Amino acid sequence: MNVLLPDTLPQALELLSQNGDAVPMAGGTDLMVHWHVRPEAHQHTFVDLSRLEALKPLSWTADMLVLGGLTTYWDVIRDERTREEFPLLVDAARQVGAIQIQARGTWAGNIVNASPAADGVPVLMAYDGIVVLESRRGREQVPLDRFYSGYKQMRRRPDELIVAIHVPRRRYSYQVFEKVGSRRAQAIAKVGLAVTRSDAGWRVVAASVAPTIRRCPTVERLLETGAAVASPSDLLPAIAQDVAPIDDIRSSAHYRTRVMARLLYHDLRDFWGK
C-alpha cells in the first residue's frame, strides 16, 4: 500500500493528477469494508486527505448550507442550525452505522462510495444538494440527482475531489426520512425514502430499490396533481416506472416494491386526493 499525505488542497489535486489510479481517503469507513472483501484493494495508491483543514468545517451563507469535503456525520448531528433547518440530514446521520462511523464518515465519502443503499445521499438529493468537484483544471458543480449514471458510476473523474456539497436553503412544508432494515439500528437499508415539499415542489427520493439512489418523478407528479390514491396498491404502477429493485441477500424485489408503496401511502396520506 502506498499512502500520500498532502498538506494542502492544491497538493492533493496535484497528486491525483499525477497518479491516475490513486484513491482519495477521507474517513476511510467504506474503504475498510472494501479492503476486507477485496484484499487486492490494498495495492492501490491512496491520497490521505486528513490534513486538509479547509475541507472539514460546515458553514452557512444567506442562500445555502455548505458541507465541506471532509465534513462528518457527527459535525451535522451536533450543529444546532442544521437540526433546525435540515432535520433530515440529522435523521440520516444518526442512522449511519455506530457512533464511531458517524464520527469519522464523511458526507462526500457517502456520495463517492455510490452505494444504492446509502443513508446520506437520499436526504441530500431530497434537499436538491449540489456536488462541487475540483481538479487542477478547475471547479464544476453537478446536481446530486444527475451525479450517478449507473451502479457505482458517477460524474467524477479520477483527478477530481468533492470539495463541498451545497444545500440550498428553502422553506419546507413537509419532510420525512424513512429507512427499513433488518434491525432498528446499524443496518443496511432494504428500502430508503426521503420526501420533501418546498416552494420548488415535491422531491421523492428512493434508496436500495434501483442500481442508484434516484428521484421518483412519476410519484412526484402524482403528488403535484393531487392524484386519488385509495390504497398502497394504487401507487404500484407509478413506483414501477421510477425504480427497479432486485432480489439479493437482504431482501426481494417484491418486498421492496410493496414496502415503498406502504411508506409513500401512509407517510403522505394527507396529500393524496380522494
Language-model-derived ranges and their functions:
Residues 1-274:
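C-terminal structural segment of proteins
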